[in-house]
Amino acid sequence: MLGKLMKYELKATARYFLPLYAAIIVLSFFIGIRTYEGPFLSLLNGILPTALVLSFMGLAVITMILVVNRFDKNLLSDEGYLMFTLPVKTTSLINSKLFTSLIWIFGSFLIFILSMFLIGWRYFEVDFFRESFRVIFSEPYFLIIIFLLLVMTIVNFLLQVYASLGVAQAYSVTKSRILGGTIIFVGIATFFNVIESLVVFLGTLLFRDNQWIQDMALQLESDYFGDILPALRILLTVVLLYTILKNVIFYVLTKYHLNKKLNLE
């Protein structure tokens, strides 16, 4: 059933993303092959990059709006009556929104990479990329941690949005769920920032004389990446585990409010 829900979500959102993807690719292609000869082409050299920047800005705005709007309208408004009568678990409803948003976010990232390639393909050095890939793939654990941290950070943002909207609708924080969700989102972010700052401060105060901590600090201050890598692995692993913990909290919070505190209009 999750597959059917995701298929429905992808169809409902594709009409917004695909035209922008096409526009970005076309603009990037023409920017990549442009020349500076003639007044008309010189004018295009100014117009095309501006249009591309505006397209990327539009893509970012649409992504944000759809993340909020699809969850709000589809689950927390009148459409929610239909969605919650379907023979599916609440987790499937949450997952369909989450996975679909992830697909479009990573799709947008790939479009950005393709756009940069189309724009600068004449200036790329094969040897530079070959060496870069060799260095990157020589540290598979580091690469995996970076990838997982990227995914979990995006998931963290999405689940925090969902949890904020769930809390806002359950307790009628404001007449507008979006406004209420924004207030809750900022409140949650502030709370975790304060907690994180306190933990870092107390950790520095209590463990500043610890030899292991001092060795890690020295490694991170090194100018040679090979010296930094061991400490960086540990640091990123801790950050990854902490991000996963927050994701679990936000997921449980979202599920609880959809199951027990749903207040449909």
Place the predicted regions along the sequence by residue:
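Hydrophobic alpha-helical transmembrane segments of membrane proteins
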Residues: 1-79, 90-265
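Short helix-to-coil transition segments within interhelical loops
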Residues: 85-89
